[in-house]
């Protein structure tokens, strides 16, 4: 495929986060981040959650130590997102503030160390 050729229509990527316990991760994302549990494969080795326009997130059981994942999430109303996640009990490791690079941003960490940078221009 040449540089100017357009790729055929494909969907957006689906992240797969490494976790020590898939079921625990699903419950955390439901309770602390407002996600809906999608499915849990028999044997509890892989499962998924979803949230509005964000689409699904897959979890796969891994034996620690593993390298946590980092995701950037655009929030249309960053103030409302911050307050909502704070009220749900999300582990906000960096509060909402304007960063030197110009974004208003806050960071949430899950129990397995995966990070989500919620931001707005």
Question: Can you name each region flagged by the protein language model?
Answer:
Residues 5-7, 38-39, 47-49, 61-64, ...:
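Short secondary-structure boundary/capping segments
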Residues 1-26, 69-71:
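N-terminal beta-strand motif that seeds the catalytic metal site of vicinal oxygen chelate
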Residues 13, 45, 69, 102-104:
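Residue-level marker for the onset of beta-strands and adjacent loop->beta junctions
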């Amino acid at each position: 495929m040449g540089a100017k050729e357009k790729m055929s229509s494909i969907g957006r990527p689906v992240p797969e986060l490494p976790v020590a316990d898939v079921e625990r991760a699903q419950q955390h994302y439901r309770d602390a981040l407002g996600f809906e549990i999608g499915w849990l494969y028999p044997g509890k080795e892989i499962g998924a959650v979803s949230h509005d326009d964000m689409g699904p997130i897959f979890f796969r059981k891994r034996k620690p130590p593993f390298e946590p994942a980092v995701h950037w999430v655009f929030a249309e109303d960053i103030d409302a997102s911050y307050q909502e996640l704070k009220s749900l009990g999300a582990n906000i490791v960096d509060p909402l503030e304007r960063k030197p690079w110009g974004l208003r941003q806050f960071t949430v960490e899950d129990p397995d160390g995966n990070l989500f940078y919620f931001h707005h221009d």
